[in-house]
């Protein structure tokens, strides 16, 4: 008889700046959940890792006079060292710059693009560079970023979008018939 599978992941830590207590807090809580589920007999797969792409990373690397890869190698190493020092029981530490990850994402993207699930368009809004977030006019607080309070700038960028509407009915049906699918319940 096969064990019930349980998949858990942290948000993958962003590598723009050195690790902080929030990274540690999240991974420790996730580790506790993974360990508990192993203890009760589930087949657990626990994923954590680092997100190593973004405008902020590029700007920081340029200011430091190094490549973005050199910058993220340093920060990702620190994040992994902390997880290992805390004896976190992850099964996989993924880095978005790992060759196998890049190739897998490219294959998935191409398949989705070829079947019409991804399309290119433009997005326009108020952009906060430190937060790497777009905001609408109504979300701004006194014309500033609602998260950090800094100035925002009007920006327009070409981007790829996923046609979620194509799958909405099936996804909603699945979530409603499998309430345990997304946890914790919001």
Locate predicted features.
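N-terminal, positively charged nucleic-acid-binding surface of large information/translation enzymes
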Residues: 1-186
